[in-house]
Structure formats: C-alpha cells, structure tokens
Amino acid sequence: MTTLLLMFVVSALPPAASADSPNQVIYSEKTFADGKTRHFTYKTVDGIVIRYFILKSSDGVIRAAFDACDVCWLENKGYSQKGDFVVCNNCGKRFPSARINEVHGGCNPAPLKRNVENGNVIIQVADILDGKRYFNFQGGKR
C-alpha cells in the first residue's frame, strides 16, 4: 500500500508548499495571507486530476474546498474568486468566502478537510482522494 501511495503526484504547488510525506500535503499558512484563492491539483495513480482550492476567508479562517460541487461538477468549470465571494464558473452562484468549507451540498464548493498547525495548512491525501468522484469523467458527460 505504501508503494501505491508514493506514486501519487502533487502538482501546481506554490513555491512555499511541500509534500512532506505520501500521506499529506503541506502549505505554508503565509501563502494565503492575501485572501486570494490558490488552486491546486492532485493526480492519482489512475490519472484522475483532482482540483481543489485554499483561501483565507474574510473572517481570517483558512478554508479549503474541491473545485467542484454536487450540481455542476460534470461541467468541469470550477470556481473563481470575485472579491469576498467564490463564484461557480458554470451557473454563476456566489458564495461568501466565510461560508466555504462550512456549507455543503447543492452548488456550494464541496468541502475539503484541512488543519492549520504551527503555521502550516495540512491536508491529508486520503481527504483529497475523497473528492475523486467530482473529477472522474469516465462514463460521464466529458
């Protein structure tokens, strides 16, 4: 099982990010201090590219979510940031940054578990893999 996990690839990491183990991805909390969303990808062994984003919301909390939702995921368009809102690039619905990772379902960005410890944002690879269903288009529309 460890060999399988070592085959995962993390890409699109900002300069301050590091993958310290095959089980977690670590980013410096400072990377998100400006409140702008940072988008990342995680490529699985079977070639599925899982997209997610992290931002520091207007209330000062580091939040993470998959770049997809329960409703629009098949369109594969994700989210963009407009001021203090995260906006669905498919349907145009707007979500306050302070609600990301708290509200789920519908067109809300699907929450991604994260922890902030000792100045680092830590995401477990297993939690990233839980979002694979939003990016697996085999047999789907794409």
Give names to the regions the model predicted.
Residues 91-97:
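Short Cys/His-centered divalent metal-binding micro-motifs
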Residues 2-11:
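Bacterial N-terminal signal peptides
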Residues 83-91, 102-114:
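Short cysteine/histidine-rich metal-coordination sites, predominantly Zn2+-binding motifs
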Residues 76-81, 98-100:
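Short Cys/His-rich "knuckle" micro-motifs
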Residues 93, 103, 126-129:
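Extracytoplasmic electrostatic interaction patches
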Residues 13-79, 114-142:
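N-terminal pre-ligand scaffold of iron-sulfur
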